[in-house]
Amino acid sequence: MKRILALFLCLLVPTVVFASNNGYRVIYDGGSLPNAKTGDPLNLKLGDKDIHFSYARGGKEAIDIPASAITEISYGQDVHRRVGSAIGLAAVTFGIGGLLALTKPKRHFVGLTWQDGDKKGGFAMQCDENDYRGVLAGLEGITGKKAVDSDAMTVKN
C-alpha cells in the first residue's frame, strides 16, 4: 500500500509543478483590444521586454505589447456597499442580513496605454486582490514607468 501511494505521489507532483501558470489572470474591462469583450478572462505574462496577453479560454494570443511602447500605467479601486443584497437577505433572515450592508467589496483595476509606432491603444483590466500589487510592480519594473493613482486624478465637485 505504501509503495502504491509513493508511486502515485511521484507521478502526481511533477505533473502539478509543470501545470502551474507563471502569469497573472486578469479580467478585461474595456478598451482597444481586438476581439475582446468586457468580462473576458485574460492571461498576463510579463517578459523581459514585452507584455503578453492571451485569452484564458483557448489560449489564443490577444496582444503582445513591447514594454518600451507603454506610455502610462494607472491603477484604481472600485468600492461598493452591498445594500441591495443586504435588504434581500435581511427580509429572509429577520434582520441578520443587515450586517452584509457593512461590508465593502473592492475591485482593483490597472490601466495601460501604449503607442507603438503609429498604433495607439489602451485598456483597463481588473486584477485579483492577491495579484494586484504584483501586476503593478511587474509592469513598473519592465517599463520603467511609475503607476499613477487614477483615484487621485479624479476631480470631485
Q: Over which residues does each language-model region extend?
A:
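Positively charged n-region of N-terminal signal peptides that target proteins for export
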Residues: 1-6
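Bacterial N-terminal signal peptides
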Residues: 8-15
